[in-house]
From Swiss-Prot:
Name the record gives this protein: Apolipoprotein C-III
Organism the protein comes from: Bos taurus (Bovine)
Site residues (May interact with the LDL receptor), renumbered to this chain: K41
Subcellular location: Secreted
Glycosylation site positions: T92
Family of this protein: Belongs to the apolipoprotein C3 family.
PANTHER family assigned: APOLIPOPROTEIN C-III
Gene name as annotated: APOC3
Database matches in Gene3D superfamilies: Apolipoprotein CIII (6.10.90.10)
């Protein structure tokens, strides 16, 4: 009777072993999916940070160009206005 009991125990162990392997595979699969999800999130965050940095740099460049253009325009306008003002306020000679 003992050999039958040993055979039955071995048979039950063989039945349980695939279930344990499936559980480990599922656990491994879950870990890999979690790792891939975290890696994807990290990559997206890094890309977003780079894009925000590029957008910020473009905005700074645009503002610098705009202020430079405005400064040039103001200098030109001021020069013309100053010339006009000086000619309008300069004393004119009256005819003799």
């Amino acid at each position: 009777m003992q050999p039958r009991l040993l055979l039955l125990a071995a048979f039950l162990a063989l039945l349980v072993l695939p279930e344990a392997t499936k559980a480990e595979e599922g656990s491994l699969l879950d870990k890999m999916q979690g790792y891939v999800k975290e890696a994807t999130k990290t990559a997206k965050d890094a890309l977003s940070s780079v894009q925000e940095s590029q957008v910020a740099q473009q905005a700074r460049d645009w503002m610098t160009e705009s202020f430079s253009s405005l400064k040039d325009y103001w200098s030109s306008f001021k020069g013309k206005f100053t010339d006009f003002w000086e000619s309008a306020t300069s004393p004119t000679q009256s005819p003799p």
